[in-house]
């Protein structure tokens, strides 16, 4: 009898878990959203599409849900940049990937890098993007100071090679490293 009850409880738990998972996936992107096509930046060989990031509004701020592949595992700096371009641009005689995106979006002229919830930092500062060991990224990121989709339209979404310490020290702009992937927010 105990085995039957345990088996029944296990089966019910599995069904409930599957239902909850499917229910969450079905309602993940309800309502208004922005889909941002993201490309791995390579000015020499041409950019390669690696997926998308879906941006939605929530009661807690904008949610950035990545559906990306072919990235290096680990944490990456993740920001909204000023200009709606992912093009390479020349700087000091060298072609720099994604430089046409400009700097971090800073409409309040804070003039410094910081945490996504800091009132005295760029509005474009997002939480770091976590990339799984298999090179995929699918964990949502919440930007609590950004409330409306219209606020980010006409900008670009940038992924940097390294992590982000959310400070200008010891390295400027969180020490995130070169621009690795980008998408224009339309």
UniProtKB/Swiss-Prot annotation:
Residues bound to Zn(2+): 104, 113, 122, 125
Cysteine disulfide links: 86-182
Cofactor(s) needed by this chain: Cu cation; Zn(2+)
Gene Ontology terms, MF aspect: copper ion binding; superoxide dismutase activity
Record's catalysed reaction(s): 2 superoxide + 2 H(+) = H2O2 + O2
EC number(s) reported in the record: 1.15.1.1
Matching SUPFAM superfamilies: Cu,Zn superoxide dismutase-like
Cofactor binding annotation: Binds 1 copper ion per subunit.
Family indicated by similarity: Belongs to the Cu-Zn superoxide dismutase family.
Record's function text: Destroys radicals which are normally produced within the cells and which are toxic to biological systems.
Description of how the protein assembles with itself and partners: Homodimer.
Protein name: Superoxide dismutase [Cu-Zn]
Provenance organism: Pasteurella multocida (strain Pm70)
Originating gene: sodC
């Amino acid at each position: 009898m105990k085995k039957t009850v345990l088996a029944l409880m296990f089966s019910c738990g599995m069904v409930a878990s599957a239902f909850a998972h499917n229910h969450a996936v079905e309602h993940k992107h309800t309502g208004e959203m922005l889909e941002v096509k993201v490309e791995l930046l390579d000015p020499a060989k041409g950019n390669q599409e690696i997926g998308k990031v879906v941006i939605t509004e929530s009661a807690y701020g904008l949610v950035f849900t990545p559906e990306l592949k072919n990235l290096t595992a680990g944490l990456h700096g993740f920001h909204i940049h000023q200009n709606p371009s992912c093009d390479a641009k020349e700087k000091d005689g060298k072609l720099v990937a994604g430089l046409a995106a400009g700097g971090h979006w800073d409409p309040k002229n804070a003039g410094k890098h910081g945490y996504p919830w800091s009132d005295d930092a760029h509005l474009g500062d997002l939480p770091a993007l976590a990339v799984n060991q298999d090179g995929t990224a699918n964990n949502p990121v919440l930007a609590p100071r950004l409330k409306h989709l219209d606020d980010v339209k006409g900008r670009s979404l940038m992924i940097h090679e390294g992590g982000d310490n959310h400070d200008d020290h010891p390295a400027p702009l969180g020490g995130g490293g070169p621009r690795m992937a980008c998408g224009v927010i339309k």
